[in-house]
């Protein structure tokens, strides 16, 4: 039976393999990444423009249910912006006090699909929204995970659907002696993050 450490190493190796496969896809789809910019070859970009659905046709063929739900989707934006603001302030003030490395927002909130030439303006706005919102959820989860490691690094008894990055460091549920002995060490152990720069 594999240990937890072995499984984590296996996951890291699979993530590295996935990254290598994604880089191969970049070559197949004629683009490369320079810093934070994605650059397509000119021929690929020209071809993409021919595949774009223009706005009038896009609206004409949109399903009614999609049109009717737009206000509900966009109503989520204000609470999301507020949460982004509050948690950024929280980690800016509290994490240095707790000696927790800050979460780099740009590692989670990635907005780049608006540069795709085969998307019309509505699709680009939708992609900006989804990139922001999903990235924000990852950013918030990482802030919460680091705060949880500091305040309550105990695994749950029940299975959790989506384990965050810090969960592997937590103490077992019901391990009272381990909690008393190891809490302070675990609370302050962010050694695996010390190479990450601040925002």
What are these regions (language model features)?
Residues 31-76:
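Compositionally biased, charge-rich terminal segments
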Residues 1-44:
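Short, non-transmembrane cytosolic segments of multipass membrane proteins
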Residues 57-199:
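Cysteine-centered metal-binding/redox modules
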């Amino acid at each position: 039976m594999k240990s937890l450490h072995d499984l984590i190493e296996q996951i890291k190796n699979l993530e590295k393999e996935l990254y290598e496969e994604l880089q191969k896809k970049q070559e197949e789809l004629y683009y490369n990444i320079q810093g934070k910019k994605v650059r397509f070859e000119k021929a690929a970009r020209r071809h993409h423009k021919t595949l774009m659905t223009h706005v009038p046709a896009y609206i004409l063929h949109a399903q009614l249910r999609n049109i009717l739900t737009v206000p509900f989707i966009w109503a989520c934006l204000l609470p999301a912006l507020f949460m982004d603001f509050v948690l950024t302030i929280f980690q800016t003030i509290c994490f240095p006090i707790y000696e927790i490395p800050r979460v780099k927002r740009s590692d989670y909130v990635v907005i780049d699909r608006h540069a795709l030439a085969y998307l019309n303006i509505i699709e680009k706005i939708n992609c900006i929204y989804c990139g922001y919102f999903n990235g924000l959820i990852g950013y918030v989860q990482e802030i919460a995970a680091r705060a949880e490691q500091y305040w309550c690094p105990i695994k749950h008894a029940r299975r959790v659907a989506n384990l965050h990055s810090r969960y592997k460091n937590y103490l077992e549920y019901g391990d009272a002696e381990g909690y008393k002995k190891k809490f302070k060490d675990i609370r302050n152990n962010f050694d695996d993050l010390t190479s990450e720069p601040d925002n």
